[in-house]
């Protein structure tokens, strides 16, 4: 309640709450706990007026090599929470992650896979499109067009060469090899009306810098490289 009040008082828009997901687990108790955790996340997203709950769906359970089984756990978990999400008015935004994170963070690796799940889940589901995770996909343009109004969030940053860490070495827009304006044009052309291209920087290097200076650089690059 305190957080929701402060957000309202500041006149802020909560584009999304990150994150839900992490459904795969080694046993039934773990899977049930993940579902309950996601139900709490839905309630939190509703309380703060978030436009969506971003889903990082989860990787392989410890010791497992069963990729198909993990994806089935994700599917089952999502189906289990959709009624609560619809009742709360919270869009469940599936975020495909780069394949290099498939083992430990998300077995959902392409926009096409995410949209296939959205087709199953129906109303109240959508996708969170992060250029860091999808820029490499040769089918990206077709899948963005397919997504259309189901794009619930749009995240931007850059892929550095070389990349030292697949999670915590993102670049600011313009630092790497992603054609961000081209992808933004696809997203806008598909009908995304969220109004925001959110700069999402997970970077040990940038976190070590002065926060005000980093924010100023983000603003500059958002105006010139996004």
Where are these regions (language model features)?
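Active-site acidic/histidine proton-transfer and metal-coordination neighborhood
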Residues: 8-9, 24-126, 136, 209, ...
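Glycine-rich, flexible loop/turn motifs
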Residues: 19, 103-104, 169
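A cross-family glycoside hydrolase active-site/sugar-binding cleft signature
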Residues: 15-20, 53-56, 93-97, 128-132, ...
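Aromatic-lined substrate-binding rim segments of carbohydrate-active enzymes
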Residues: 2-11, 16
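Histidine-acidic metal/acid-base catalytic patches
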Residues: 8, 108-129, 135-226
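A structural motif
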Residues: 12, 45, 50, 151, ...
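Conserved radical SAM core fold
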Residues: 20-25, 60-62, 160-166
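Short active-site-proximal "capping" loops at secondary-structure junctions
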Residues: 1, 19-24, 204
């Amino acid at each position: 309640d305190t957080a929701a009040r402060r957000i309202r008082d500041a006149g802020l828009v909560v584009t999304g709450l990150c994150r839900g997901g992490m459904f795969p687990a080694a046993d039934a108790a773990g899977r049930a706990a993940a579902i309950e955790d996601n139900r709490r996340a839905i309630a939190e997203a509703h309380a703060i007026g978030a436009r969506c709950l971003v889903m990082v769906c989860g990787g392989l359970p410890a010791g497992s090599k069963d990729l198909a089984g993990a994806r089935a756990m994700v599917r089952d978990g999502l189906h289990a929470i959709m009624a609560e999400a619809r009742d709360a008015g919270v869009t469940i935004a599936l975020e495909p992650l780069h394949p290099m994170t498939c083992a430990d963070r998300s077995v959902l690796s392409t926009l096409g896979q995410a949209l296939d799940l959205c087709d199953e889940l129906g109303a109240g589901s959508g996708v969170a499109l992060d250029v860091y995770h999808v820029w490499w996909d040769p089918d990206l343009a077709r899948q963005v067009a397919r997504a259309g109004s189901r794009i619930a969030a749009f995240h931007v940053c850059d892929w550095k060469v070389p990349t030292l860490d697949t999670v915590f070495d993102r670049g600011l827009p313009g630092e790497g090899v992603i054609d961000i304006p081209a992808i933004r044009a696809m997203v806008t052309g598909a009908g995304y009306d969220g109004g925001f291209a959110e700069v999402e920087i997970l970077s040990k290097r940038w976190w070590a810098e002065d926060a005000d200076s980093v924010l100023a650089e983000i603003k500059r690059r958002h105006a010139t490289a996004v």
